[in-house]
Amino acid sequence: MAHSIWHEKIKSFLPEHYYGRINHFLDEAYASGLVYPQRENVFKALQVTPLEETKVLILGQDPYHGPKQAQGLSFSVPEEISAPPSLINILKELADDIGPRDHHDLSTWASQGVLLLNACLTVPAGQANGHAGLIWEPFTDAVIKVLNEKDSPVVFILWGAYARKKKAFITNPKHHIIESPHPSPLSSYRGFFGSKPFSRTNAILEKEGMTGVDWLK
């Protein structure tokens, strides 16, 4: 399901048998209609970014709900798929902040310790937030609580009102929070553009004696 260390830590913040409830939910959801991402990618964020390597969290809300977009990493799409509007704006801010990145699959961020997590890990095709409030929030809140317990600093990048509510779980003074409006077209001009989250994250990591992220990779 997830990287084994993640699994053990997350379980400590969940009611007994919650993983069984998740599996039952997934069985029913994927049997009853088209759901994104593909089932093998539901926990991809936790599979490709081990807990011990995680130094940044970028929190999304739920997966893209269009064909072939969602790949289990927040905001990322496969290279052959056109970038959705929020990702276009993320890459625009990255270009203004650090430099241009000519591809929009963010897997290389995940392999550098950037946990690309959605608060809701599945979505019915064509229905944004269609699985919100059903099963996922206690699980992904537990992920944030696990990160909060880390001894090494983590930079939490929270875009938009929904993500910013999760600050309540970030109580460890070792960690850092970068927050701004969401990169969606509706809010990007209200403070997302110009917020420089990428250079700010690297400045924090380097000040903490950690390696910055190669955001252009």
From Swiss-Prot:
**InterPro entries membership:** UDG_fam1, Ura-DNA_Glyclase_AS, Uracil-DNA_glycosylase-like, Uracil-DNA_glycosylase-like_sf
**Per the UniProt record, which EC number(s) apply here?**
3.2.2.27
Active site per the UniProt annotation: D62 (proton acceptor)
Q: Which residues form a coiled coil?
A: none
List the catalysed reactions: Hydrolyzes single-stranded DNA or mismatched double-stranded DNA and polynucleotides, releasing free uracil
**Predominant localisation class:** cytoplasm
Q: Name one GO biological process term.
A: base-excision repair, AP site formation via deaminated base removal
Q: Name one GO molecular function term.
A: uracil DNA N-glycosylase activity
Quote the subcellular location field of this record: Cytoplasm
Pfam families hit by this protein: UDG
GO cellular component terms? cytoplasm
Q: Does the keyword Disulfide bond apply?
A: no
**Keywords in UniProt for this one?**
Cytoplasm, DNA damage, DNA repair, Hydrolase
State the protein's purpose: Excises uracil residues from the DNA which can arise as a result of misincorporation of dUMP residues by DNA polymerase or due to deamination of cytosine.
- What name appears for this protein in its UniProt entry? Uracil-DNA glycosylase
